[in-house]
């Protein structure tokens, strides 16, 4: 798959975290956890498309740490998707396996913050594109702040969903329009003296 295809798929799935709250009434024939498993699978799979494109662009650099970081991100997202699939097949399951797999949702968000920082440091994406993965990664600290300010209620959920739809859509658009160009750029790693 080329980056244009990956970006298109990512853009199609990026708003599903937000859309799920509007779409749930139309899927009343599904158990609510099956519904969350369905939209979660679409959302996480779209995110995986963006990360695969970052990998193709070598956005985290060509060093071992940068390459491993994106493989870890893809692995964390795949494990998070396993929890979505469990919700689809066995709604209501609260086994230890589900709890462990479900923990990869927040862990993948936390790891995306590290990915975003690494992309900024490596400076392989030009201009504003360099900061987009960091924008996505900032979802985690924004949610921590919101939970401390507003609790785990509707306000935090709304902020999480809107932030997610905007940031992940910008990431998808960045991937869509960057094409393959960044792969050819020489690394101009930022030096902090």
Model-predicted regions and their roles:
Residues 1-193:
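Hydrophobic, aromatic-enriched alpha-helical segments typical of multi-pass transmembrane helices
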């Amino acid at each position: 798959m080329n980056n244009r295809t990956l970006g298109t798929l990512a853009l199609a799935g990026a708003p599903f975290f937000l859309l799920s709250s509007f779409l749930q009434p139309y899927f009343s024939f599904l158990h609510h956890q099956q519904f969350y498993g369905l939209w979660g699978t679409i959302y996480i799979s779209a995110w995986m498309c963006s990360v695969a494109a970052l990998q193709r662009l070598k956005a985290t650099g060509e060093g071992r740490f940068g390459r491993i970081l994106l493989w870890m991100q893809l692995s964390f997202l795949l494990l998070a998707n396993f929890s979505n699939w469990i919700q689809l097949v066995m709604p209501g399951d609260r086994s230890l396996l589900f709890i462990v797999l479900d923990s990869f949702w927040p862990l993948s968000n936390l790891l995306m913050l590290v990915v975003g920082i690494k992309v900024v440091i490596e400076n392989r994406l030009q201009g504003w594109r360099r900061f987009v993965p960091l924008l996505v990664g900032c979802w985690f600290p924004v949610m921590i702040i919101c939970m401390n300010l507003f609790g785990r209620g509707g306000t935090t959920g709304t902020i999480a969903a809107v932030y997610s739809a905007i940031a992940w859509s910008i990431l998808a658009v960045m991937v869509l329009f960057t094409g393959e160009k960044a792969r050819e750029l020489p690394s101009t790693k930022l030096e902090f003296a």
